[in-house]
C-alpha cells in the first residue's frame, strides 16, 4: 500500500493510493488514473499531492511534483507532537496526541504515511468518520499545521516560554 523511495534532496516520498476513474462520454468510457502522494524530509517538513493522468506513472509524477510544491513546516517536539491536536476535512476527523519514546506510530493507513514522512516517531492517532485517504491526509495536514510550539504561543502572548510551560 505505502511505497517509499529516497530522492537526491533527501525527501521521502510515499505513494498512498492509486485509483482508476472514468468519464462517460457518448462513445463509452474514458479511463484515467489518480494518485495521492506525500513527501517529507523526516524533519518537520511535509506536503501532499494529488495527480491525475491517463497513465499511472504520469499521475504519480504529477502528484509528487504537487507534493514538493505544497510543503509546509510542522513544529515537532523531539520526534513527537507538541500537544494533542484535532484536524477536520469534510467527513474525516483525526485526533493525534504525543506519545512517549518507544511507542512508535500508532495510526492507520494514510495518516501513518503522513506522520512517517513528517518525521514523527511516537504518536497515538485515530481517524473518525470518513476514512477516504484524500480526506484523511488533508485532515492530518490540517491538524499538523494548527500545532503550536511553546515558543510560538509565548511570542503571541508576549510572555516567556517558562511562563507558558508553567
UniProtKB/Swiss-Prot annotation:
One of its GO terms (cellular component) is small ribosomal subunit. It comes from the Bacteria. InterPro entries: Ribosomal_Su5_D2-typ_SF, Ribosomal_uS5, Ribosomal_uS5_bac-type, Ribosomal_uS5_C, Ribosomal_uS5_N, Ribosomal_uS5_N_CS, Ribsml_uS5_D2-typ_fold_subgr. One of its GO terms (biological process) is translation. Keywords: Ribonucleoprotein, Ribosomal protein, RNA-binding, rRNA-binding. The keyword rRNA-binding applies. GO terms for molecular function: rRNA binding; structural constituent of ribosome. Gene3D superfamilies: 3.30.160.20, 3.30.230.10. Residues 11-74 form the S5 DRBM domain. With S4 and S12 plays an important role in translational accuracy. Belongs to the universal ribosomal protein uS5 family. Part of the 30S ribosomal subunit. Contacts proteins S4 and S8. The N-terminal domain interacts with the head of the 30S subunit; the C-terminal domain interacts with the body and contacts protein S4. The interaction surface between S4 and S5 is involved in control of translational fidelity. This is Small ribosomal subunit protein uS5. It comes from Sodalis glossinidius (strain morsitans). The lineage of its organism: Bacteria, Pseudomonadati, Pseudomonadota, Gammaproteobacteria, Enterobacterales.
Amino acid at each position: 500500500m505505502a511505497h517509499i523511495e529516497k530522492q537526491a534532496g533527501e525527501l521521502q516520498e510515499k505513494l498512498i493510493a492509486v485509483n482508476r476513474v472514468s468519464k462517460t462520454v457518448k462513445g463509452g468510457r474514458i479511463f484515467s488514473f489518480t494518485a495521492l502522494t506525500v513527501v517529507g524530509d523526516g524533519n518537520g517538513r511535509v506536503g501532499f499531492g494529488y495527480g491525475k493522468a491517463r497513465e499511472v506513472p504520469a499521475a504519480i509524477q504529477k502528484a509528487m511534483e504537487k507534493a514538493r510544491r505544497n510543503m509546509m513546516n510542522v513544529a515537532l517536539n523531539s520526534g513527537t507532537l507538541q500537544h494533542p491536536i484535532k484536524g477536520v476535512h469534510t467527513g474525516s476527523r483525526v485526533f493525534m496526541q504525543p506519545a512517549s519514546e518507544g511507542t512508535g506510530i500508532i495510526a492507520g493507513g494514510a495518516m501513518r504515511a503522513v506522520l512517517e514522512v513528517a518525521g514523527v516517531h511516537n504518536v497515538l492517532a485515530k481517524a473518525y468518520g470518513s476514512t477516504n485517504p484524500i480526506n484523511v491526509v488533508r485532515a492530518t495536514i490540517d491538524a499538523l499545521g494548527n500545532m503550536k510550539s511553546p515558543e510560538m504561543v509565548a511570542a503571541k502572548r508576549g510572555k516567556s516560554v517558562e511562563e507558558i510551560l508553567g
